[in-house]
C-alpha cells in the first residue's frame, strides 16, 4: 500500500468515467444486478412453477442505486498499486465478478470504501449486501455497536434541525420571492435558475408535491388548482403512484397564486431535461440567495412542514397521508414534527395552550378536517 491515501474522491471521479466506459461494463453490471433477485424457494424448487418464472423488472431508482454501488465495488476491487495507472485494464476485476472468484473479502471492501469517502453505516451495509449477493458470499453484517464518522455528523445535523424554525425559513424565502424574484426577467440566463426555483418552491408549498413532481405542472394546471381546489391529471407522474389518473390538492392558496403570477410571465421556463439535478440546484440557490443558512437543505422539508401543520390543526392522519399522496399513513408518521415548525398557523398564542387537546378533538370529528383544509386554502 502507498504511504499516502491514493484512494480518494478525485481519484475515484477519474476511475468512475473509465469504469462506466469499459466495453464489459453493461454486461457484467446486468449479471451483478440479476444476482440481487431473491426468488422464493417454493417457486424456484417447484417443478411446475419454476418453468413459468419471469424476472420482475427493477424500478429505475433501484437500478440507479445498484449502478452507483457496482461502480464503487469495481473501483475498490482495484489494488492501490494500480490506482494511478489510468491505462490499467479492468479485465481482472470484471472476470472476478463474472466468475465469482474473490479478489477482496467484505471486510477489506469496507476498509477501502471508508478510505474512499465518509459514508453512513446504512450506505456501507447496502453496498456490502450488493457485493455478497453478487459474489455468492455468506451474509456480512457491520457490528451493531459501530457508529461511523458520517453517522455522527448527521446525528449532530439532525439535532440542529430539531431547533430549526421552519416557519421562519419559509417566510424568509417567500418574502425574498415577493421582493426580489417576482419581477425578474428570464431573458437573463443568470436569473432563470432563481425564477425556476421560486415557481417550484411555491408549487410545493401550495400542494405538498415533491420537487420533481412540482416541476411537471403547467400554468393551466395551476389555474385549475386555484379555481377548483383539485386537479385530476393523467400526465403528471407521482412517486410510487401506479395510477394513471392522479389527484393533486390545493392546500395553500397564496403560494399557488404567487407561482402562477411568476409562471405566467415565463410559461416555458420549467421545460428542462427529465433526468436532471437542476431543480435541486435551483432550490439550494434560492435558499442561499434568500439568506437562509442550512447545513443540509432538502426540498422535502416543505412536505414535513405541511404534514405537521395539517395534523397539529386536527386533520386526521389518513387525510394528511392522502394530501401528501402517500399510499400508507405509516409513511406520513415519519413526517410529523421532525422539525420545529414554528407557531401553529391555525391558532393564536392564547389558544396554543390547549393545542394538543383541540387537535385530538378535531381528528375525532369528521367535520373539523374540512374546516382545517379550507383555512390552508385561503392562505
From Swiss-Prot:
Keywords for this protein: DNA recombination, DNA-binding, Transcription, Transcription regulation
Q: Please name the Pfam families in this protein's record.
A: Phage_integrase
Q: Which PROSITE patterns match?
A: TYR_RECOMBINASE (PS51898)
Return one GO MF term.
DNA binding
**Comp. bias intervals (Acidic residues):** 346-358
Which Gene Ontology biological process is one annotated for this entry? DNA recombination
Active site: residue positions: 210, 239, 303, 326, 335 (o-(3'-phospho-dna)-tyrosine intermediate)
Name the Gene3D superfamilies on file: Intergrase catalytic core (1.10.443.10)
Q: Which InterPro entries match?
A: DNA_brk_join_enz (IPR011010), Integrase-like_cat_sf (IPR013762), Integrase_catalytic (IPR002104), Tyrosine_recombinase_XerCD (IPR050090)
On whether Magnesium is a keyword of this UniProt record, the answer is no
Q: Which residues form the Tyr recombinase domain?
A: 169-348
UniProt region (Disordered), positions on chain: 346-379
In which residue ranges is the amino acid composition biased (Low complexity)?
362-379
- Which family is this sequence assigned to? Belongs to the 'phage' integrase family.
Briefly, what is this protein's role? Answer: Plays a role in nucleocapsid assembly and serves an essential function during the final stages of the DNA packaging process. Participates in the processing of branched DNA molecules at the late stages of viral genome replication.
Q: What is this protein called?
A: Very late expression factor 1
Amino acid at each position: 500500500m502507498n504511504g499516502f491515501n491514493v484512494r480518494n474522491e478525485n481519484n475515484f471521479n477519474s476511475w468512475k468515467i473509465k469504469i462506466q466506459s469499459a466495453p464489459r461494463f453493461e454486461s457484467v453490471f446486468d449479471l451483478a444486478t440479476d444476482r440481487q433477485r431473491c426468488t422464493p424457494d417454493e417457486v424456484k424448487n417447484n417443478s411446475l412453477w419454476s418453468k413459468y418464472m419471469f424476472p420482475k423488472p427493477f424500478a429505475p431508482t433501484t437500478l440507479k442505486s445498484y449502478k452507483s454501488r457496482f461502480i464503487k465495488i469495481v473501483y475498490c476491487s482495484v489494488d492501490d498499486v494500480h490506482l494511478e495507472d489510468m491505462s490499467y485494464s479492468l479485465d481482472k476485476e470484471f472476470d472476478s465478478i463474472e466468475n465469482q472468484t474473490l479478489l477482496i473479502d467484505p471486510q477489506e471492501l469496507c476498509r477501502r470504501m471508508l478510505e474512499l469517502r465518509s459514508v453512513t453505516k446504512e450506505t456501507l451495509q447496502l453496498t456490502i449486501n450488493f457485493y455478497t449477493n453478487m459474489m455468492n458470499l455468506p451474509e456480512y453484517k457491520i457490528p451493531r455497536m459501530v457508529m461511523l464518522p458520517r453517522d455522527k455528523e448527521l446525528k449532530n445535523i439532525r439535532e440542529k434541525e430539531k431547533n430549526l424554525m421552519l416557519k421562519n425559513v419559509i417566510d424568509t424565502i417567500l418574502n425574498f420571492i415577493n421582493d426580489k424574484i417576482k419581477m425578474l426577467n428570464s431573458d437573463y440566463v443568470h436569473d432563470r435558475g432563481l425564477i425556476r426555483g421560486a415557481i417550484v418552491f411555491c408549487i410545493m408549498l401550495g400542494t405538498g408535491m415533491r420537487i420533481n413532481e412540482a416541476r411537471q405542472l403547467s400554468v393551466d394546471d395551476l389555474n385549475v388548482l386555484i379555481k377548483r381546489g383539485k386537479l385530476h391529471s393523467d400526465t403528471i407522474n407521482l412517486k410510487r403512484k401506479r395510477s394513471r389518473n392522479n389527484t393533486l390538492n390545493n392546500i395553500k392558496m397564496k403560494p399557488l397564486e404567487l407561482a402562477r403570477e411568476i409562471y405566467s410571465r415565463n410559461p416555458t421556463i420549467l421545460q428542462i431535461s427529465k433526468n436532471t439535478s437542476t431543480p435541486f440546484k435551483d432550490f439550494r440557490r434560492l435558499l442561499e440567495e434568500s439568506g437562509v443558512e442550512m447545513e443540509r437543505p432538502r426540498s422535502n422539508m416543505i412536505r414535513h412542514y405541511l404534514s405537521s401543520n395539517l395534523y397539529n390543526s386536527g386533520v386526521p392522519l389518513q387525510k394528511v397521508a392522502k394530501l401528501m399522496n402517500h399510499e400508507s399513513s405509516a409513511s406520513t408518521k415519519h413526517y410529523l414534527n421532525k422539525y420545529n415548525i414554528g407557531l401553529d398557523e391555525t391558532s393564536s398564542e392564547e389558544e396554543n395552550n390547549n393545542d394538543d387537546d383541540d387537535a385530538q378533538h378535531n381528528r375525532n370529528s369528521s367535520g373539523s378536517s374540512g374546516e382545517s383544509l379550507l383555512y390552508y386554502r385561503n392562505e
